[in-house]
Amino acid sequence: MNSPIKLPKGSITMCGIDDFRDTLEPEHVVVTLCRWQPTWHHSDKNERHHYYFRAHDNDPAIWGHALNLVTDLLEADKDVLIHCVHGRDRTGGVVYMLLKMLDMSHDEVFKVMSEARPSQADEWSDRLYRREARYDKIIEEYINQYRERR
């Protein structure tokens, strides 16, 4: 079962399409990072956002857009449910970078993410380590662009 990561403002919960319905709560604002927008039941009242990009894209601007979207929702004190197909690569990357920007170490981020989404812990133990330098570069670019806009 997936659990929310409580943040200074709002929370973020991760899932994939296979456990989306089991994870979705009425208070969630849904951020979909899949290629196709999900089909919603007429009774679904959740606020929804859709942004697709390839999981292994190295363009900081593309990841930065996803970070902006989620950060804006969290700053508004929303409870965000973020998902992609597996809830691992795009979802994991965005959440990893968000937590790193809160001054958590790699090991702390891995622990928090694995506790929140235990089904991906084995995958993340390797993937997050291999992608750490790339994610750190994206974070640096994101922060620099944020400073330029201020």
PLM segments and residue spans:
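Cys-dependent protein tyrosine phosphatase-like superfamily
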Residues: 1-81, 86, 93-150
